[in-house]
Amino acid sequence: MSKLQDRHGGEAAADVGRRARHQRLLLSFPVFPIVLLLLAPCTIFFFTSGDVPLPRIRIEYARRDAPTITAVAADTSPPPPSPPSSSPPPLSFPPPPPPPSSPPPPALPVVDDHSDTQRSLRRLRQLTDSPYTLGPAVTGYDARRAEWLRDHTEFPASVGRGRPRVLMVTGSAPRRCKDPEGDHLLLRALKNKVDYCRVHGFDIFYSNTVLDAEMSGFWTKLPLLRALMLAHPETELLWWVDSDVVFTDMLFEPPWGRYRRHNLVIHGWDGAVYGAKTWLGLNAGSFIIRNCQWSLDLLDAWAPMGPPGPVRDMYGKIFAETLTNRPPYEADDQSALVFLLVTQRHRWGAKVFLENSYNLHGFWADIVDRYEEMRRQWRHPGLGDDRWPLITHFVGCKPCGGDDASYDGERCRRGMDRAFNFADDQILELYGFAHESLDTMAVRRVRNDTGRPLDADNQELGRLLHPTFKARKKKTSRAARPM
């Protein structure tokens, strides 16, 4: 019995040993590499085949409110046949188009904040809406400004006897010019105004920002002037000049004493404004306005006619009915000012000075070809009138370009270059130079100051270089007197 158990037990042990050896042989055989070798081509074919639909991931950037990542089912339709190629197919493909049942929302146009497209997207003020305002009404301004000036004596409203503190205000559009030469012309126009302000001791503020979308175009000046008045109580007078204004008499300065009792000085004629009621009876491209309550009230009465759309269109028709020879196009700031003076003369007329004794506005077409004659006949600036105009205004010329120019662009550019050179010569001559002619940018030496640079033979040049208002008053004391 024990032998039988030993024999069967030995056989069982032998079977166990044989199975263990078989398992070791299986484990030692390279099964996994062979399986990988067989499956790899199948896997590559499976993933690269265009006939197998797979889920895809598409990233959309169309709109801010669209989901950032969207899972889209693959298109089950067969792809269009591709031309044969000797190169192997790429391993990745662009995501398929979205299914027709759920197209992505259209993207909103990306436009400039001040472009015509963006303005068209804004809601225009309707006639049934409340009238436009520049801001909260300002009351008691004169008393508050006087108190501020008393508390800040270091910022007087007068910079000398009979000379008020003047801030010249100008600007241009926020975008680059359509005409490639336009930005250069605007730069020269700014340089011209800076020269004039430096000679006369004026401050200058240049804006290329639309402060309020409803006050665009010609109307941009109104919110700007109001903001500067409130921010600079030390400024007595603000002088607005359009970007196409060129100062051509660098010595002449307005007679400030003449305007002590007036708050608005603008080029015009009483008969043309109050009599003929013509919208061309004054020019709003250059005017001087006092920093006071009256002026703030005028701006508040002026601005509601300026919002684009139905409001401008309505007032344009009203101006055409009220003013002489005024076409019925949309309202402009100049016609609006004439309309206020004509219909509310009792309120505004007494404080408005319509100036025509000198050229606070001079029409360029009548001036630019006479500069050489002015030099020969009058020899030096300081007159300010038609003999030697203070301002040459390029009305109807669009230095920045555009389809609404009234005059030929080449003619305007030639006239502006002549005006800039004519004015610039009055500055260059202070240092002994001048342009070879008004039609060229080349300069030449006209005076040799190397030997006697401090000579003051030319009194007019001395007035420009060293005006009396910039000089300190002489003070004498007993200690300084000779014994």
From Swiss-Prot:
Record's bilayer topology term: Single-pass type II membrane protein
Segments in the Cytoplasmic topological domain: 1-26
Primary location recorded for the protein, binned into one broad class: Golgi
Pro residues bias (residue ranges): 77-108
Record topology, Lumenal segments: 48-483
Disulfide bridge positions per record: none
Protein localization: Golgi apparatus membrane
Membrane keyword on record: yes
GO molecular-function term, one example from the UniProt record: xyloglucan 6-xylosyltransferase activity
UniProt protein name: Probable glycosyltransferase 4
Source organism (scientific name): Oryza sativa subsp. indica (Rice)
